[in-house]
């Protein structure tokens, strides 16, 4: 304010947290009891009292608050899915509204009872909800046993759980497994899992998923002071029905793709023919009197696995022998060991994580003797064509150089020789706050 009058301004980078698509004004409000009285499904708005003053009521379904606006230098952000009402206008009040979307009549909910019915309620997970959590995993359209508390919590000492559950009209419709790193102020979905995308009920809609993802981001930011949310998506081959609503939500939240690992999966319904070299190896394995069987000989296989991973990839198993035995005892129908034996000795093995849609080889290893007999080739074909022929996919795992985004071309060449083709495991970064 100076002798020339007053000036207020707003810049998209520093003051308005979205690209402004529409601006409108409210004026001549004398005698008007209220304006607004609705919520938007997708549109965000910033409201400013350009002249005069008024009260802004905001209701997010859990908290109702009233803010008095009386300055052109201060605005209030109205997030999507928040109910708003403008009232108690002073004489001569002028209101400016900046919106993130063009006008869309279908984006409005103008009946408060309907609004309450459409709300998604967020509840933080606690151990008392473990039974309900696990029951939802079983019926979710994209659930796997890795989301069960018996799997997620086996290393609870290493991860601070901050998982969330979402309800609509009292019914559980979504869950987000998540862990909190206080030092880095980062939430990860989930720090102890290969993937950790949102679990959805069959009835959950795309709009529901948008609301859940936005609510989760706001909760992580407000409750923990989190600055980042690392989100590891669940590959589509694990979905019992299409479940990529979260990918659209990530796009809307301007999430950044920061990691992509390439796995190789065999389609058991539509086999791509094996390459000639793999066919020769499989033929050789069939002449070597190998026996393929499910086994409980974890203590015999684990030293072989550790030796192979160290010598060929300079790495170690993610699980210790005690951890994998504990998990296999908790999930005997899902975590299985298959071996190839020659003269009674284990010469190759595969630890399989079995889900409804996928048999995933969590670990593969072959001894020097097994290599001579092409035992691992024979074991993979046994899994894909016999043991798991009724599964849509056999996932042979990723082929990345440890700790990098670089492809191990030799390893993926071997897997593709069986007719396996690429499935990606993606990681996104969502900026919070």
Language-model segments: what does each one mean?
Residues 1-76, 91-94, 98-119:
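Non-catalytic, conserved peripheral segments adjacent to functional cores
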Residues 77, 194-206, 364-373, 400-402:
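A short, internal acetyl-CoA/4′-phosphopantetheine-binding micro-motif in the GNAT/acyltransferase core
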Residues 78, 250, 415:
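Conserved active-site tyrosine of GNAT-family acetyltransferases
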Residues 91-93, 159-161, 223-226, 335, ...:
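Short, high-confidence coil segments that cap the C-terminus of an alpha-helix
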Residues 122-185, 233-370:
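A conserved beta-strand-loop-helix scaffold within acyl/acetyltransferase catalytic domains
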Residues 167, 176-178, 212-215, 334-433:
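Aromatic (often tryptophan-rich) hydrophobic motifs at membrane interfaces
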Residues 180-197:
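Conserved acyl-donor/pantetheine-binding loop and adjacent beta-alpha core of acyl/acetyltransferases
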Residues 193-240:
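A gly/proline- and charged-residue-enriched helix-loop-helix capping module
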